[in-house]
Amino acid sequence: MNEDHPIARVEPLLLIAIGGFVGATLRYAVSATLPGGFPWGTLAVNALGSFALGLLLYEARLTDLLSAETRLTLGTGLLSSFTTYSTFAVETTALDPAMALVNVGANYALGFLAVIAARAVTRGSLP
């Protein structure tokens, strides 16, 4: 099937939609299981999603075993819906200033550390 065929043009959208449905559902499930008072669910999904996306991208680069469709479904679809910047921003503004700083620092620090850890895992060793 060539790239001009209507199905070939719709396929990426369907792959993203399927991944997005799964990612958003998983995000809701994680957030629903963690205690309130602090946005633990958003922090957890952002850190886990950063780790998973790091694994996906570094593994794809190192092994070249993941197809473009797999990267699109898992990266753009599932993990982009699993992690959430907008919820992070809204929840942060609802916190008192000291806790808002903790939340911002924790989200960014854990996100970067998760990507670094994923990179180390794909290379076969932790730093």
Where are these regions (language model features)?
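Membrane-interface helix-loop junctions in multi-pass transporters/channels
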Residues: 1-127
